[in-house]
Every structure is written in structure tokens, then in C-alpha cells.
């Protein structure tokens, strides 16, 4: 990692923070705000992390690196080769054909020879490792961060979690948040669909303890590979070798039968008693909401080893945009060829960062026959991690660039009709809070591949329309119409919820189809109708398609408000991840925050719109 830091410094992508800052909130808050600056801000190296313990201050001799992945330039520096080149290599590998002549044969031999790098190579441990075992183990000696005020504690957020199947035939590298309970216990938040969880059940059935090792740092590409959506049974370090063009060099662990890369900065080893679960959380997650307290497995740590000059790598997740935007971009590009294997008419796809990946995907396809888009929808919802996507919109090959926001929205609105909207049900991300049931909920697929026959509405200005609708639905506060020149304008309405569900009250507006097409209801207290970026983030987070959509002849009503018992939603509704104003003021006093008010208004850093406008 030291070499990567030198590279960042050379290219002006690194900011060094020498001011002592607390591992509880201060470091994470500063990194969170930095990531929202234009072009992702800088990578931040905190040289003096501290922790206040009663009347004393604990200093850590280990710097903390954050926002390391947080720009396209830093991605390029990390990869050392163009993303397009990696994508082409992946495509060539997946579409391997027998050579037709001698020249093609030589190329095939070269490609096959390059695959020798995919298998990790065993090596010995570095001799200068500092090793702590048994009673010497103390996780509290690491600068593990508490990132959000309501978090259940400190969490390791960029740990490479190494596991293997009971018969040692399958290996997995994943990334899961890891809660520090005490000196030698970590909570393992691996969800029901993760490979590690499948291995866990094997060990539980056999009634033996499961070995788990966690590595931090080293080549940052290990960390990205831990997030890669590979098919079950394919080891992520093989992907590392494919991308790097060299074998991952792995060393044996001291306490268990696993191996981890020998250049990692920190290694935590131990075992999981599969018969014991502990409450884990809450945690402010990448959805921008806190996930609730739930039981998860616990790692009993037997060994911690680290380099003398080790660096602690961490991230902060929450409301977008953050560095996972760039990590997700690499995933998009590299795995497009793999997705095309299951959906061969797929041309391109895009996961907007304010759709927080699984909540929204746009896809461009070659449409060849009636209902083709619906066929691809089902293909998406049946493939790996794509099965967790809640909302998918499909456009034809003549559509604009998927990243040209205004152009693609106008295209979709011209082609949208309720007849071409498919509402289904299936598995969803375990972090999704809007679904009525855990890990299962509604899905919405929109076929916008051809022109709609929906007639254009008779437009009213915002003031006239507001007065008309308030007469029939008294809890409406404000509204704003987007893209009024299209066939399906979007009318966003802020409401104050009382004792009835919004979807029930929306039936009072069915008589105004002449003026309405797509109507989206949001909470007045937490939304700025003039901020479409944050509106989209809240909308796709807060809806379950089967429960929260009402349709009529030409209208499509969507309830994106917070849900409760009145909405027949009986799960706990979470709060948003908001920065602590006390911490923000402390960072300001230390001269570390600039342009905070602008970023706060744009990305709702501290609290929702209706409150923050009073403080700015």
C-alpha cells in the first residue's frame, strides 16, 4: 500500500491530515464530506488517529487511509491498465473459440498462457511481522472507526474476509462489515445470499468451528475483488490474478487452515462457533439508512499480525455519492460481458450511484420481438446479484447514452406506459428496508423500448395544479413538475402523513387524469423538491412496487413516503445516516472543513431539507 500512496502523492490525489482526529466519528465524517466534493475529492491519510478513553487520550501508531478508491483517476492508478482493456480481455475469455489459422492459434496460446496467473501461489510469511496471539490479542489497539452516531460500535469496513468450504475445495473472498465487540470478538455481517453464509451452514451441520481470516490493506485490488459479484465457487483471488497479470502470493495463517495475501498490512485470524449468534448493529449502511440490530455469527480472534509500517484501510458508507460509486463503476464495466452471457441482447447497463446499485438499473438492449424486454427483466432477476435489483428500466438501442441523465429520462418518459410496466415479486437485498418482509419484496420492470400510445396531458402550472389537488387531498403541501414537455411528466408531491396511507388517499386524485401521468409522493419533512438527485435516492429506497403503486387508465401513482402500520408495513422503518452537528462544528474549529454549507444543501449531510434550511 505504501507504493500506492507514493503514486497518489505524485499525481496530487492524496491529502495528508496531520491534525489529531478521533476514530469515533471525526475521521469518518471528514472522509464522508471529502468524497462528495467534485471528482471525488482526494484520498485522505490520517496520520494521528486518537481515541478518547475517559480522561485519557489513546494514540494509535497506525495511520488511517480513506477514500482511496474515490475517483476515476485513482481507479486508473490502481489498475495500471485501462478498464476497457480489462473488459475486452474478459469478453475474449468468455467467448473463446477454436482458432481458424496459425496466427489465431498463436493468440489463443498467449491468452491461455496468461491464465497461468489466476491461481494463487503459496509463499512464506514476512519475517518482520508483529504477531499477537491469545491473551495478547487486542482489537482495540487498531484504529477501527465508528462512522455514524447511532452505530452499535466501531466497525471494520474494508476487511477482506477469507473463508473456505468444509471440504476445503471452495474458497471465497468477500467484504462484510465487522463489528468490534471487545478485544477478541468480531461480528460477521454476512447475509443469507453470500458464499460465506453457505459455508457457515456446512460447518454448522457438521458441528465444527469455522475458520475465518480477515486481511486489511496490501494491494488495494484485493479489496475491490472482495466486492466482485463472481458466480458461486469461483475464488476472487483468481480474478485478482487475471486483472493484475500476476499470481496473488498467499501465506498460511498462524491459527487456522486458511491463506491470505502476504503483502497485507493487517491479518486477523480465528474461528466461528456456528452454534452461537450475537446481536449485531445498528449500522449506517450504503443505502444511506441504518440497518437494524439482528443476530449474526461471531469470530473469536486467536491471532492478529501486522507490519511495522502498516496502514489501516477504511471506508465510510451512507448517502451518495461516495467512493463505492467508483468501485461500482469498475464492477459495471468488467462484468458487462459476463451479464451478456445470460442476456445476449444486452448492449449496456448503468447503475446510477443515487440508486445505490440494487435499487435502480438502466439497461439498453437490442429489441427483436414483442415482450423481449420483459424476457430480459426475468433474466436479470434470475442471475446472481442482479436478482436483488428492485427497479429496472429497459430502453432500445436507439436510446441516448444511459449516463446522459436528461436525455435518457426524456426518452423513457416518451416511451413509458403503464401497460409496459411489470410488477413482480422476488428476492431483494437484505439491506432493503421498504419490503414488507425480510429479503423479499416487490420489483418493478419498465419496458421503454418503443413509443407509447399514452396521450399527452393537459398541463397546468405548478400553482394551479397544487390548488386543484389540495382540494381533494388536504395533506398535500407542495408539488413540482419535472419534464412537463414529455408524454409522461413527473409530478413530485410532498405530503404530511397523518392517519391514512398515501396510496388510499391518492384514489381521490383519479379524477384528474387529464392533468397527471406519473405522480410520486414524498415526505414533506425530509425532501427538497428542487433537488432531483436526493429525491431519486429517497424514492427508490422507500418503495415496494407491489404495495406502493396505484395505476389507473393513464396515471401511475407511487408512494415513496416512510411506511408504518397504516401502510401495512410492520417492520421497523430506519432513520437516515446524518452527520453529527457537534462533530461538524469541531472539524470547522480545527480548520478542516470548507464549502460545507454548499455540500450540505446539495447532499443532505446533516439532516433533511426542512430542518437544514433553518441552520444554513
Swiss-Prot record:
GO annotation terms (biological process): ubiquinone biosynthetic process
Signal peptide positions (record): none
Protein's UniProt name: Uncharacterized protein HP_0396
GO-annotated molecular function: 3-octaprenyl-4-hydroxybenzoate carboxy-lyase activity
CC terms in the record's Gene Ontology section: cytoplasm; cytosol
Family designation: Belongs to the UbiD family.
Protein's organism: Helicobacter pylori (strain ATCC 700392 / 26695)
Amino acid at each position: 500500500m505504501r507504493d500506492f500512496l507514493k503514486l497518489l502523492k505524485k499525481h496530487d490525489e492524496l491529502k495528508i491530515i496531520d491534525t489529531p482526529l478521533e476514530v469515533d466519528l471525526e475521521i469518518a465524517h471528514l472522509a464522508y464530506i471529502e468524497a462528495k466534493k467534485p471528482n471525488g475529492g482526494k484520498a485522505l491519510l490520517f496520520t494521528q488517529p486518537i481515541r478518547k478513553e475517559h480522561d485519557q487520550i489513546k494514540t494509535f501508531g497506525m495511520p488511517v487511509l480513506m477514500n482511496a478508491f474515490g475517483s476515476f483517476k485513482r481507479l486508473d492508478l490502481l489498475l495500471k491498465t485501462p478498464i476497457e482493456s480489462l473488459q475486452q480481455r474478459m469478453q475474449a475469455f468468455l467467448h473463446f473459440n477454436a482458432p481458424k489459422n496459425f496466427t489465431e492459434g498463436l493468440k489463443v496460446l498467449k491468452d491461455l498462457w496468461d491464465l497461468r496467473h489466476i491461481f494463487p501461489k503459496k509463499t512464506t510469511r514476512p519475517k518482520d511481522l508483529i504477531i499477537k496471539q491469545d491473551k495478547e490479542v487486542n482489537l482495540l489497539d487498531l484504529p477501527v472507526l465508528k462512522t455514524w452516531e447511532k452505530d452499535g460500535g466501531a466497525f471494520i469496513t474494508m476487511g477482506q474476509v477469507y473463508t473456505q468450504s468444509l471440504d476445503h475445495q471452495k474458497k471465497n473472498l468477500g467484504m462484510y462489515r465487522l463489528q468490534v465487540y471487545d478485544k477478541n470478538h468480531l461480528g460477521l455481517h454476512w447475509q443469507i445470499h453470500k458464499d460465506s453464509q453457505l459455508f457457515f451452514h456446512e460447518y454448522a451441520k457438521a458441528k465444527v468451528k469455522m475458520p475465518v481470516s480477515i486481511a486489511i490493506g496490501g494491494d488495494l485490488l484485493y479489496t475491490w475483488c472482495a466486492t466482485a459479484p463472481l458466480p458461486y465457487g469461483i475464488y476472487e483471488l483468481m480474478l485478482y490474478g487475471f486483472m493484475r497479470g500476476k499470481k496473488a502470493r498467499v501465506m498460511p495463517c498462524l491459527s487456522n487452515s486458511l491463506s491470505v495475501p502476504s503483502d497485507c498490512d493487517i491479518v486477523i485470524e480465528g474461528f466461528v462457533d456456528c452454534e452461537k449468534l450475537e446481536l449485531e448493529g445498528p449500522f449506517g449502511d450504503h443505502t444511506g439508512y441504518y440497518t437494524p440490530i439482528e443476530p449474526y455469527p461471531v469470530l473469536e480472534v486467536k491471532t492478529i499480525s501486522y507490519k511495522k509500517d502498516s496502514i489501516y484501510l477504511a471506508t465510510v458508507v451512507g448517502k451518495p455519492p461516495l467512493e463505492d460509486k467508483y468501485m461500482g463503476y469498475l464492477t459495471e464495466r468488467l462484468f458487462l460481458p459476463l451479464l451478456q452471457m445470460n442476456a445476449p441482447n444486452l448492449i449496456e447497463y448503468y447503475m446510477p450511484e443515487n440508486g445505490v446499485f440494487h435499487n435502480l438499473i438502466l439497461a439498453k438492449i437490442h429489441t427483436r420481438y414483442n415482450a423481449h424486454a420483459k424476457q430480459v427483466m426475468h433474466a436479470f432477476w434470475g442471475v446472481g446479484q442482479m436478482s436483488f435489483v428492485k427497479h429496472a428500466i429497459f430502453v432500445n438501442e436507439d436510446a441516448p447514452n444511459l449516463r446522459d441523465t436528461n436525455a435518457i429520462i426524456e426518452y423513457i418518459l416518451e416511451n413509458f406506459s403503464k401497460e409496459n410496466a411489470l410488477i413482480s415479486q422476488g428476492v431483494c437485498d437484505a439491506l432493503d428496508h421498504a419490503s414488507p418482509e425480510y429479503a423479499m419484496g416487490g420489483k418493478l420492470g419498465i419496458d421503454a423500448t418503443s413509443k407509447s400510445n399514452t396521450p399527452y396531458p393537459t398541463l397546468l402550472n405548478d400553482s394551479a395544479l397544487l390548488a386543484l389537488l389540495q382540494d381533494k387531498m388536504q395533506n398535500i403541501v407542495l408539488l413540482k413538475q419535472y419534464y412537463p414537455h414529455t408524454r409522461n411528466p413527473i409530478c413530485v408531491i410532498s405530503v404530511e402523513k397523518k392517519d391514512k396511507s398515501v396510496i388510499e388517499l391518492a384514489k381521490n386524485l383519479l379524477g384528474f387524469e387529464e392533468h397527471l401521468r406519473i405522480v410520486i409522493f414524498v415526505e414533506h419533512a425530509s425532501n427538497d423538491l428542487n433537488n432531483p438527485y436526493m429525491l431519486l435516492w429517497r424514492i427508490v429506497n422507500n418503495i415496494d412496487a407491489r404495495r406502493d403503486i396505484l395505476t389507473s387508465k393513464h396515471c401511475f401513482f407511487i408512494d415513496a413516503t416512510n411506511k408504518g402500520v397504516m401502510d401495512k408495513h410492520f417492520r421497523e422503518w430506519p432513520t437516515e445516516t446524518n452527520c453529527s452537528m457537534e462533530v461538524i462544528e469541531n472539524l470547522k474549529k480545527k480548520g478542516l472543513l470548507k464549502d460545507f454549507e454548499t455540500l450540505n444543501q446539495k447532499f443532505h449531510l446533516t439532516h433533511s431539507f426542512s430542518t437544514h434550511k433553518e441552520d444554513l
